[in-house]
């Protein structure tokens, strides 16, 4: 929707289309190993969208995990390098394709000289994608309306994925894939998952994603990046006041309160402020 149309190199675009992962209905695992799409990150030039600030490109991705995003170029022609990683993920209860008869399917991998069970290989590959390659993550789970498996079959793998992302503070959001994303039941489940995982949970129908949905997903991911620096701008003359001066003390108290409440970039939106004697307002 928002990457392929902006790839100027026709041959690169065709190769990328050929490299896109397959998908199908049912319980059979379609992915066998991590796949980088495209092999070389696609560089695209995005037009400035209505209502956006000059020089602020609006990148997008479709699924899984997006590593190595880099923005460059002038304000008139913002560029972005984007690459998708499609990986097996952690095994969902009831999925098929990881067994040969009654025994685990054994596979050869770059990470071991010996053959290892497919489930183990999938776990190792997914962990490497999360820890070593991805810049941001998208956890795709479901309410159980998209296929043959019930909601509870996904919970263990869902929790494992979130645990891995939280362990390294990787920015991510959760997509709740549903045939009825706007129903009361789905909205209620999304609220429960948001409370459980303390991150944005967006109900969507992945088969019917629109550009607006993708922009909304990316906006929420941007709000999950950790705050590493906060700058305060105060009147120059206040810097000459002693720390114990009532005005200086109130400024320091206000700044400390802001720092204590800001952990992710999205916390700026929720920043609350009560006017005091000297500090009457904040501009952020």
Where in the sequence are the language-model features?
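Conserved C-terminal guanine-recognition region of P-loop GTPase G domains, centered on the G4
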Residues: 110-197
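Extended, charge-rich low-complexity interaction segments
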Residues: 225-253
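Conserved, well-folded catalytic cores of nucleic-acid-processing
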Residues: 6, 10, 90-91, 164, ...
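Conserved G1/Walker A P-loop phosphate-binding module
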Residues: 1-102
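Canonical P-loop GTPase G-domain recognition
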Residues: 179-236
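Conserved small/polar residues in nucleotide/adenosyl-binding loops
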Residues: 284
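A solvent-exposed, charged loop/short amphipathic helix patch at secondary-structure junctions
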Residues: 98-116
């Amino acid at each position: 929707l928002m990457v392929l149309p902006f790839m100027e190199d026709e041959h690169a675009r065709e190769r990328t289309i050929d490299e896109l992962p397959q998908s199908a209905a049912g319980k059979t695992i379609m992915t066998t190993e991590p796949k980088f799409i495209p092999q070389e990150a696609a560089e695209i030039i995005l037009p400035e969208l209505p209502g956006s600030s000059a020089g602020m490109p609006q990148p997008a991705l479709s699924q899984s995990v997006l590593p190595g995003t880099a923005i460059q170029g002038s304000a008139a022609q913002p560029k972005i390098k984007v690459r998708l990683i499609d990986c097996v993920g952690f095994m969902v209860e009831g999925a098929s394709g990881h067994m040969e008869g009654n025994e685990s399917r054994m596979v050869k991998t770059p990470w071991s000289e010996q053959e290892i069970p497919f489930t183990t290989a999938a776990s190792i590959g997914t962990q490497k994608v999360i820890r070593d390659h991805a810049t941001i993550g998208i956890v795709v789970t479901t309410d159980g309306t998209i296929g043959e498996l019930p909601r509870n079959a996904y919970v263990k793998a869902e929790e494992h994925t979130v645990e891995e992302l939280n362990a390294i503070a990787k920015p991510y959001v959760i997509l709740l894939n549903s045939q009825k994303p706007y129903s009361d039941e789905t909205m209620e489940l999304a609220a429960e998952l948001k409370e459980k995982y303390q991150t944005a949970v967006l109900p969507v129908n992945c088969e019917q994603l629109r550009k607006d949905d993708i922009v909304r997903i990316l906006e929420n991911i941007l709000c999950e990046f950790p705050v590493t620096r906060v700058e305060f701008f105060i009147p120059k003359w206040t810097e000459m006041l002693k720390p114990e001066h009532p005005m200086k003390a109130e400024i320091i108290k206000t700044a400390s309160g802001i720092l204590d409440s800001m952990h992710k970039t999205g916390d700026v939106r929720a920043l609350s402020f009560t006017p005091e004697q000297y500090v009457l307002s904040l501009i952020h």
